[in-house]
């Protein structure tokens, strides 16, 4: 990049006060929401998780191509499709050669789907939980899905200027308890910025005593964007563990290191070029016999962050809902969201706390883009 180009880029206003920034987040959110609805429809008895993940990424790419059509537009997948059933808490996205590629969904499976898109580096991720069933869902599966959905709604309304991260942690815990469930221990929600989905400000779920004492307390502020990731389990502890399943989702970090292996340099160069700072699936890179060796060196020296496949320690059912929100001058805007199908989840439990009930009934702004496309500013061309 030339000095002139660098100076021009630093002059661009990427804050929420720039309507174009908000518009890009909204477009990314619409893409993510529309795609995840289609992926939910793919979750039928006999459907293989590998096929669903591949099709999810195809749908993301197809949808992304149709929006923000400018010359050399910077846009793409912000999180590859992950499909995690039952006690698999997160990040299952297998290669065709993996044993899990043959894992097929069956009736009654509780399936979590996570994916996301970005426009010009502004990412909107979304996650939902569905059940492979034609009939309404009852029992523990219904309880955990209802708990996670209600907890997300409460978090969306608690994350606002003046409140702290611990208020969110505590209200999610109270709601999960109302449904006889537990938030998944140690799961994080992050502040987001351009090209950053894991910013410094974090909200932790179900922290240990040491995590609670070590994590900073912070106040939410106007102008911030958050990826709100709520995971709840039917298990009594909510604790998860790393599985033996191969990690297939990674993200490039800001760490620097002189790689020794040619295979490492090759794969790292491809990652930089194709995905930049966003998570990617190794399904989408050139794979040969030395690729795993290259990925291992990159990971061991922290050039790549691995999104490991996590399992509930006690075999509990895990539900997840993820929403991207923006704290604007006019209030909170929900940029991406996904709720369970109406009248599909039949839990016999509910939130009783009158303050939380009132909070859940508080209106919140949901984005609706105008059908007429807006011409991007020159800064985005």
Curated annotation (Swiss-Prot):
Q: Which Pfam families match?
A: Peptidase_M24
* One Gene Ontology CC term in the entry: cytosol
Q: For this UniProt record, give its keywords in alphabetical order, as a comma-separated list.
A: DNA-binding, Nucleus, Phosphoprotein
One Gene Ontology MF term = DNA binding
Phosphoserine PTM positions read 8
Q: So where does this one cross the membrane?
A: none
Q: Does the keyword Phosphoprotein apply?
A: yes
Domain of life, per UniProt, equals: Eukaryota
> What InterPro entries is this protein classified in?
Creatinase/aminopeptidase-like (IPR036005), PA2G4 (IPR004545), PA2G4/ARX1 (IPR047113), Pept_M24 (IPR000994), WH-like_DNA-bd_sf (IPR036388), WH_DNA-bd_sf (IPR036390)
Q: Which residues carry this modification: Phosphothreonine?
A: 362
Q: Where is this motif: Nuclear localization signal?
A: 368-375
Localisation: Nucleus
Q: Member of which family?
A: Belongs to the peptidase M24 family.
Q: Briefly, what is this protein's role?
A: A non-essential protein that preferentially binds curved DNA. Binds non-curved DNA with a much lower affinity.
Instruction: Please give the name of this protein.
Output: Curved DNA-binding protein
Gene assigned in the entry: cdb4
